[in-house]
């Protein structure tokens, strides 16, 4: 039996993220992951540096870095800088980009581009010369300015091409779809809320705490294939309203308040059935059974992102649920 699943948390980089990280550290979360979507949130590296300086033991990391946002040399320097602030605590996730790209009106990068970028960043962090844009690139800091040491890199992947890159270059994989037991490190992103005993998933509190996670399902399916949302409750009406927005501006509206709030246009999508079907929403016993099943399937780390006006309540409730009795490990 392997060690129990690690319970980590994820946040959009915002004004309260240091306080959230301090609370997460105090109640036993393994790591704080921050998103890298500059059209929506604050700069991921600035906020990670602040967390590094205001916490002592909790792991930290960006999830996920997207190659087009920073030159490989700039990215490697940022990684090394934060690693120096929190030695041994930093891990990095890199992927093709979904929200970060979509909010700029772009599609995700190809896996060929992303593979090259990961290899470049890894080489630069090891002090190697790498070819970037046809020229030799290398970190050449004065002595003592940047550390040269390996930093764990997980690859954010869901399909076969990404999983192949994760096997080749990653220390693990990060996913939003299911478990991958072939990896020693498999991190799964989760959203939702632990309901109080007897609480309805249609309560006002549940809608505030898990609603942003449900509406993201519609956003993602729309970006993959607009017709997909027509099969979801309220999907055709939501799509019709969204598509009244001029196409050159639509990407800005689609992801409004992503994983933070539910904008007016999305509120009709909320339902108790939607929350329990598409998010980690339910009473503690239900979620604990799901957590154990997920661990048994091969997930080694859960990244729980709390939403709503009472993030502290969500963090505590999820950790209480996860900590009640021994957690199942993977075989």
Region spans (language model):
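Active-site-adjacent structural elements that line small-molecule/cofactor binding pockets in enzymes
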Residues: 1-331
């Amino acid at each position: 039996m392997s060690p129990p699943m690690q319970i980590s948390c994820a946040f959009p980089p915002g004004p309260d993220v240091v306080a959230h990280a301090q609370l997460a550290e105090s109640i036993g979360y393994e790591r704080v992951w921050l998103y890298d979507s500059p059209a929506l949130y604050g700069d991921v590296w600035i906020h990670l540096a602040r967390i590094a300086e205001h916490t002592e033991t909790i792991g930290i990391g960006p999830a996920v870095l997207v190659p087009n946002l920073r030159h490989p040399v700039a990215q490697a320097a940022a990684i090394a800088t934060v690693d120096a602030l929190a030695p041994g605590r930093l891990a990095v996730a890199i992927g093709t980009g979904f929200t970060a790209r979509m909010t700029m009106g772009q599609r995700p990068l190809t896996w060929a581009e992303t593979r090259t970028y990961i290899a470049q960043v890894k080489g630069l962090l090891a002090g190697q010369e790498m070819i970037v844009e046809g020229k030799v690139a290398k970190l050449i800091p004065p002595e003592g300015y940047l550390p040269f040491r390996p930093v764990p890199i997980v690859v954010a992947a869901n399909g076969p091409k990404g999983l192949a890159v994760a096997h080749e270059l990653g220390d693990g994989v990060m996913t939003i779809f299911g478990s991958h037991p072939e990896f020693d490190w498999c991190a799964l992103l989760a959203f939702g809320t632990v309901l109080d005993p007897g609480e309805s998933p249609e309560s006002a509190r549940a809608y505030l705490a898990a609603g942003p996670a449900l509406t993201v399902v519609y956003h993602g399916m729309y970006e993959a294939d607009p017709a997909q949302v027509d099969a979801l409750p309220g999907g055709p009406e939501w799509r019709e309203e969204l598509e009244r927005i001029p196409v050159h501006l639509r990407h800005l509206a689609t992801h409004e308040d992503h994983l933070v709030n539910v904008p007016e246009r999305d509120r009709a999508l909320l339902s108790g059935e939607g929350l329990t079907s598409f998010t980690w929403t339910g009473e503690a016993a239900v979620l604990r059974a799901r957590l154990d099943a997920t661990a048994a399937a091969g997930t080694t780390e859960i990244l729980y992102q709390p939403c709503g006006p009472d993030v502290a309540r969500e963090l505590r409730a999820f950790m209480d649920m996860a900590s009640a009795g021994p957690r199942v490990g993977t075989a």
